[in-house]
């Protein structure tokens, strides 16, 4: 989504940054896990397909995606590469054509050692606050596998209520209507959040040959963040996610 192309959200436990091609290799390693693919209802993709997917999400105006970083590690000095701070991702999907104020939320803490420490809760609250204040959302929905009890409990703690269950898809649907009291509660829970500009850093080479990259259905980005320069091999896919 172009709206958050230069936006980072800094919380106490997590930092949310736009999903760029710098993050793709580690994300690809995560999704080799059969457990994660099952919990997120995802298909296994090749590295090339992951880059193409990231590029397409850069342009899609109905997808707001952030990578979740460990705030403590990210704030260390000297600052480590973002890839080494990655712990998961969080998304808002604005795909209901009849109701543009509804956002479907997904959160994944991919690193097992970071689970059950409140990172998923804070990441969800940060993106919900962003959705309410920047995207005009008044309703949130989460679809979760029936066996994923930790995620169900987390969203219930965020005031979501179960509204449907599908035995066919083995999932439950939870929803939160953002009334004025709920909006106030969300903003209170995220009063510590800082919104900062996410500036393009010096491009780093991706781990693929030029011939491989030319076969991708995504124009190669220039180091300045503009699309289309096939002579540049960078890890920054226009920072349009």
From Swiss-Prot:
Full protein name: Alpha/beta-tubulin-N-acetyltransferase 9
Record's function text: N-acetyltransferase that mediates the acetylation of the N-terminal residues of alpha- and beta-tubulin.
Gene field: Nat9
PANTHER family per UniProt: ALPHA_BETA-TUBULIN-N-ACETYLTRANSFERASE 9, N-ACETYLTRANSFERASE 9
UniProt keyword annotation of Membrane present: no
Keyword presence, Metal-binding: no
Domain N-acetyltransferase: residue ranges: 34-181
Enzyme Commission number(s) from the entry: 2.3.1.308
Enzymatic reactions: N-terminal L-methionyl-[tubulin] + acetyl-CoA = N-terminal N(alpha)-acetyl-L-methionyl-[tubulin] + CoA + H(+)
Biological classification of the source: Eukaryota, Metazoa, Chordata, Craniata, Vertebrata
Cellular-component GO terms for this entry: protein-containing complex
Family: Belongs to the acetyltransferase family. GNAT subfamily.
EC top class named in words: transferase
Entries under InterPro entries matching the protein: Acyl_CoA_acyltransferase (IPR016181), GNAT_dom (IPR000182), NAT9-like (IPR039135)
Keywords, in A-Z order: Acyltransferase, Transferase
MF (Gene Ontology): tubulin N-terminal-methionine acetyltransferase activity
Any Pfam family hit: Acetyltransf_3
């Amino acid at each position: 989504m172009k709206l958050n192309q230069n936006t980072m959200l800094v919380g106490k436990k997590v930092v949310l940054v736009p999903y760029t091609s710098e993050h793709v290799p580690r994300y690809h390693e995560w999704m080799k896990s059969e457990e994660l693919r099952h919990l997120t209802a995802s298909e296994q993709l090749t590295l090339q397909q992951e880059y193409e997917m990231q590029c397409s999400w850069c342009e899609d105006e109905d997808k707001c995606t952030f990578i979740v970083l460990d705030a403590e590690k990210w704030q260390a000095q000297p600052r480590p590469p973002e890839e080494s701070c990655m712990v998961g991702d969080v998304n808002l999907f604005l795909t209901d054509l009849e109701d543009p104020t509804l956002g479907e939320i997904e959160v994944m803490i991919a690193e097992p050692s970071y689970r059950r420490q409140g990172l998923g809760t804070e990441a969800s609250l940060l993106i919900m606050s962003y959705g309410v204040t920047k995207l005009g959302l008044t309703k949130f929905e989460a679809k979760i596998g029936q066996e994923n009890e930790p995620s169900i409990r987390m969203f219930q703690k965020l005031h979501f209520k179960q509204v449907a269950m599908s035995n066919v898809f083995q999932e439950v649907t939870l929803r939160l209507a953002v009334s004025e009291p709920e909006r106030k509660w969300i903003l209170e829970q995220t009063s510590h959040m800082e919104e900062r500009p996410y500036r393009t850093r010096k491009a780093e080479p991706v781990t693929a040959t030029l011939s491989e990259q030319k076969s991708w259905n995504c124009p190669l980005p220039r180091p300045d963040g503009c699309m289309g320069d096939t002579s540049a091999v960078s890890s920054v896919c226009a920072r349009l996610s």
